[in-house]
Amino acid sequence: MRSPQSLRNGETPSPSPRPPRFPTPHFHSTVSLQKLKRFNLLILVFRLSTFCFSLASSVFMLTNPTWYHFDAFRYVFAANAIVAIYSLFEMAASVWEISRGNTLFPEILQVWFDFGHDQVFAYLLLSADSAATALAKTLKGGDTCAASNAFCVQSYIAIALGFAGFLFLGLSSLLSGFRVVCFLINGSRFYV
């Protein structure tokens, strides 16, 4: 066996390989990877449903004649439009996570961002739709709905779609809360 050549003229040995800049992912079995993919797809489906219902509610309220004369209906439009935009962003973040295997933001920030915003926007939708329901009930008792039945029906549809958006955002919030708990217990958003 040949001996290694000694260093000549004060050369220094080559540096040892550097550790990776990003931490290596945890080992997961094939079954756990499938569970994670299903979990992330379920979140994506809930976010897509929230987006569809909130966008539809905003469109129904926007096309409703004279909706802007009532504060509660303006609140429904604004809340559903905000939630639709937020859901669109969260869908993009979910697709990123499914395709790339990591989060858009650092993991701790992403977990708390999702949970906190899901909570805030769910309560925003619930309060807007509750206020609009009270106004719609008042208008039904008055002569507004007798004069323009289409206005009231379209308002009812927009409010119902807003409540459906709240339902799916609430389910997303439950899954986000589960991820927060997993992060607090395991130090990772994964539950396996």
UniProtKB/Swiss-Prot annotation:
Which stretches are Extracellular in the membrane topology?
Answer: 62-75, 129-156
Q: Where is the composition biased (Pro residues)?
A: 14-23
Q: How does it sit in the membrane?
A: Multi-pass membrane protein
The residue spans the entry assigns to the Cytoplasmic side of the membrane are as follows 1-40, 97-107, 178-192
What Pfam families does this protein map onto?
CASP_dom
Region (Disordered) spans which residues? 1-23
Spans traversing the lipid bilayer: 41-61, 76-96, 108-128, 157-177
* InterPro entries, sorted: CASP_dom
One GO cellular component from the entry? plasma membrane
Q: How does it assemble?
A: Homodimer and heterodimers.
Q: What is this protein called?
A: CASP-like protein 4C1
